[in-house]
Amino acid sequence: MACQSSYLHIDLSADLLVPDFGEKVIEINVASLKKLGILLSGRGSNFEAIAGSITSGRLRAEIAIVISNRADAPGLESARRRGLNAVLIPSKGRIREEHDSEVVAALKQAQVDLVCLAGYMRLLSADFVRAFSNQIVNIHPSLLPAFPGMDAQKQALEYGVKVTGCTVHFVDEHLDHGPIILQKTVPVLDGDDAHSLSARILAQEHIAYSEAIGLVLSGEVEVQDRKVVRKPARAEAK
């Protein structure tokens, strides 16, 4: 099953972690843009990074809907402040398949082209994954297949690796397992603890997620078995 991995609490006031959203807003034809659906359960820092990339023109896409399963998710309020279609679909006390069915219906109604998990702390059912085959992406704070699941940063420190990072991958029916789209490396320093390492990984996540989304939406890559590969260049017509 798919699951968005958890993160330690990071102080987003640090300059290192805040994406630069101060660039000039680029006006583009919204009708031609691919639509994103964002799922989040918490503060949604990767959602903020994606939204900032769109505002600055670095990512050509439109956020069609932001869905949270938690009413107290700061990311949901952030989406409302941005004037986005922010939807609460509570999950507490509900059967997973029933809740997923409602989320899928909302995503379908919004006509999204790609579903992005941004701190969505729910396991996705097999029906959900099948409804958006190779159209759901997740970001995980390790170089998969190393250190899947919870507390990936702590796992990396305890194992003693010298390099870790983050991975953007398609979601399949297994945890942190789908085909890898893009990875970025982060060195593990001698004085690192889980918080300092998490902070540096998160800074790279903010870059990597938008890059990977742009790559997928460009149509230049495809999934072959477990591999995400670039499509062959078309021969020019004579």
Please provide the spans of the model-predicted regions.
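One-carbon transfer enzymes
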Residues: 3-238
